[in-house]
Amino acid sequence: MLPIAKLEAVQRRFQELEHLMCSPAVLAAPAELQRLNRERTEIEPVVVAFARMRDVERRIAEDREALSDPDLSELAQAELPELELERERLAAELEVLLLPKDPNDTRNTVIEIRSGEGGEEAALFAADLFRMLCRYAETKRWKVEVLNLSEASAGGYKEVAALITGQDVYSHLRYEGGVHRVQRVPSTETQGRIHTSTATVAVLPEADEVDVHIDEKDLEISIAASGGPGGQGVNTTNSAVQIKHLPTGMIVKCQDERSQLKNKAKAMKVLRSRLLELEQRRQEEAQSAERRTMVGTGERAQKVRTYNFPQNRVTDHRIGLTLHKLDKIIEGDLEELIGALRTHRQAELLRRGGLSGPALEPAT
């Protein structure tokens, strides 16, 4: 049974938000306008689906009334089953849409990819993963901005960080967090032996300055000449920035830009996102183990996926899904994989009757 009173309240809130966003006071405050627009965007699918269901219910009532009319009964009888199926579909959609939302889901996202076990092959795999996510971002019309890039001497990346901006970025990429494993024959392998390597992906919701306050006295900032693979200079200026957050010991480096100020701004962006994630994880630790084991929590030590090149196979270990289309997935065709993870998470939430708080998945 759908909570009609709750749906009507959401409808009223949507109308209120549209009114507020037109007020001069809000238009003069960009941060407040952004906050209200984020809320409006989040509840709009509920309002649209509820309006469609109300329209379907109205048509069902009209058709039932028309059954007693000899001129209209045949048409009404033909239309009713289709309308009733549509009502059931919309009711199921609304049930999912009303699940608790993670406030991070509409945020932009910082991704950090680091090579793990496997030496040179791990660095190449880290580069493959970054390229895969960039290609996926292209299909979603998201923007990718490199924040930091450390190349390995034999190719690939020791680590790479990027900010991905667009609609509902975090709600899709949250599932990429964890340890990714690759099984393939390296180009340098003369006997055809399969090597196993890993790379770790961290997925962080972008933090605004209002989300995380950082005191300048808690920062230790050092400047150096930027460096590339094999000690080669990326540029000749002292523009590379390293920031250490003294209370937590976190260290962030950025050397992607020629401007020291731009590198510092990018490093601060990553630091804020890491601190926001740290605080949210502390809060989650106080919650049930059941919630923490849900798909999409992005635990960094969790083995999430294996990419087997000889078999053209990708296996997601969290939901036991195997797809024999690695060649397409590594080129950014992640829609089927991420869609299955989102569906699985929604099913978990429905089965458990919904859970509140920041690890939950929005419906689209």
UniProtKB/Swiss-Prot annotation:
GO molecular function terms listed in the Swiss-Prot or TrEMBL record: translation release factor activity, codon specific
* Primary location: cytoplasm
Instruction: Establish whether keyword tRNA processing is in the entry.
Output: no
Entry's localization field: Cytoplasm
What PROSITE patterns does the database record attribute to this sequence?
A: RF_PROK_I
HAMAP family associated with the record = Rel_fac_1
Q: Which family does it belong to?
A: Belongs to the prokaryotic/mitochondrial release factor family.
User: What is the protein's name according to its record?
Assistant: Peptide chain release factor 1
Record organism: Sorangium cellulosum (strain So ce56) (Polyangium cellulosum (strain So ce56))
